[in-house]
Amino acid sequence: MYDAAFYRVGSLSSPDFALNLRYQKSFSGSSIANRSAEEMKRIGVPESQAVLWGKELNTFLPNVEPGQTLTAIYSPKQGTTFYHDGKQIAQLPGAEFSKAFFGIWLDPKTSAPKLRTELLGQSCPPPIFSEAC
C-alpha cells in the first residue's frame, strides 16, 4: 500500500513530528479519508467524531498514484499540516484531531502494531500520546 516514515523535530521529547507516506498503489482521496475514519474508530475515537473528521479529510485529500507522497506534520501551535508531494494542501488545528489521525499508526491500539514498532524504533511515542516510557 505505502511505505511509511516517522520523523521527529529536535529531541525525542519534542512535541513536533511528521509522518510521510509514499504510496505503492493508486488510491482515491475519498478511499484514504474513509479508511482513516475507520481506523480512528478502531483506536477508540467515537463514531460520530470519526465520521466528521473523515468528511473533513475527504474535502482535501487528493487521489494518489504510485510514488506520490502524503506528509502530515504536527506542531502544537498549528495542529496538523498536510502536504501532497511537498505542496501544502490543508491545515487542521487542534490536538484532538492530530492525536486521532496520527494514532492510526502510533496509538498502541493501531491495527498495524508491527508498523508502529518500526516507525517508533526504540523511542517513545510523541508527547501528544501521553505514554510513559
Where in the sequence are the language-model features?
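Terminal leader/tail segments of proteins
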Residues: M1-C133
